[in-house]
Regions:
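Aromatic- and acid-rich polysaccharide-binding/catalytic face
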Residues: 45-47, 209-231, 278
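N-terminal module-boundary/linker segments of secreted carbohydrate-active enzymes
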Residues: 1-62, 304-326
Length: 326
């Protein structure tokens, strides 16, 4: 099914935009509100692995388990499953924001290739002083995230995976140093792809600066976040990202406050692969109703009922789609 989803994304690219929605962990509240108001349902459900790592899981077990269960059900019913990963730091004052976390990524960076090391080898390397405790803790978190993603592989459900976003913004503990960020990204990619065999992942790198780009071999899609309360398709940034690689990559709006207009995308030749609006008050009130804080009812209705917008009911069976002829 992963090949089928990749083929669908490639075939659809430049023609229509796929509707996605980020959800409150463990629920489909935002999606339910959109369906009620427009009669159409987002094709993509975007969750987050933030509660699934050891430093957070015990205190947020219900959220984490409900989130995984909801995403699995979404995938079983033919929807596109997507996960971000706002990674709570593995030690110290645990948060993902740099100004409230005490974790220092530079303390974990090593020149050694540890992507295939098992627990015993990691223990030996740490006891020998060849890698730090912080290095081991990072790998434990990556392994915990991989364990969650493996549940989807086991059910032949592809996952659009967009971890550690906006590294070039210095907002998060994984940002601030391009070299450290790229080291972490490549470690995570190799650990999940080679060590854990997660061949169901479609990798999305989110950022603006080429200095932080890990390389064409380490991602399938380049994503961008927009928090500018504008229906603009941001054609300038679309062009800039398109020029970042020699091998063309799909481009996507991985998070936004106000939904971009598909009509403007077509007008400006900036047809992103998908959009995914932010969760919570970006879309709904505390009562689960449409908030209209950023996107009005009329705009939401127009976007979701546009011929340029792909909704859940229009998705193919990805297993069959993989073998369809052009």
């Amino acid at each position: 099914m992963t090949l089928g989803l990749k083929k669908f994304l490639a075939d659809n690219y430049g023609k229509r935009v796929i509707a996605g929605q980020t959800v409150t962990p463990g629920s489909n509240a935002e999606i339910d509100a959109i369906t009620r108001e427009t009669g159409r349902t987002p094709a993509m459900r975007t969750g987050d692995l933030m509660f699934c790592t050891p430093s957070k899981y015990e205190g947020t077990k219900e959220y984490a388990d409900n989130e995984v269960a909801a995403a699995l059900e979404w995938g079983r019913n033919g929807g596109i499953v997507s996960f971000g990963w706002h990674w709570y730091a593995p030690e110290g004052k645990s948060d993902y924001y740099a100004d409230t976390s005490t974790f220092v990524l530079g303390d974990a960076v090593t020149d050694r290739d540890i992507s295939m090391a098992d627990d015993e080898e990691l223990k030996t390397l740490q006891e020998s002083g060849l890698i730090s405790e912080q290095t081991v803790l990072l790998l434990k978190d990556i392994d915990a995230a991989a364990e969650v993603l493996d549940k989807f592989r086991g059910e032949n459900i592809p996952v659009i995976f967009q971890p550690i976003p906006d590294g070039d913004s210095s907002m998060y503990w994984w940002g601030g140093s391009a070299e450290n960020y790229k080291w972490l990204w490549k470690l995570m990619f190799q650990r999940m792809d080679k060590y854990h065999g997660l061949n169901n992942l479609i990798w999305v790198w989110n950022g603006s600066s080429g200095d932080y780009f890990p390389g064409e071999d380490y991602c399938d899609v380049i994503g961008q976040s927009f928090y500018e309360n504008s229906p603009s398709p941001f054609a300038g940034r679309f062009s800039a990202l398109a020029g970042m690689t020699d091998v063309p990559k799909l481009l996507a709006v991985t998070n936004c406050d106000r939904l971009p207009s598909p009509d403007y995308m077509r007008r400006d030749s900036a047809m992103w692969s998908w959009f995914s609006a932010g969760s919570g008050n970006c879309m709904i009130t505390n009562n689960g109703e449409l908030s209209e804080k950023y996107t009005s009812w009329q705009n939401l209705h127009d976007i979701y009922n546009s011929e340029l917008c792909v909704t859940l009911d229009e998705l193919p069976d990805f297993e069959e789609y993989a073998f369809q002829e052009e």
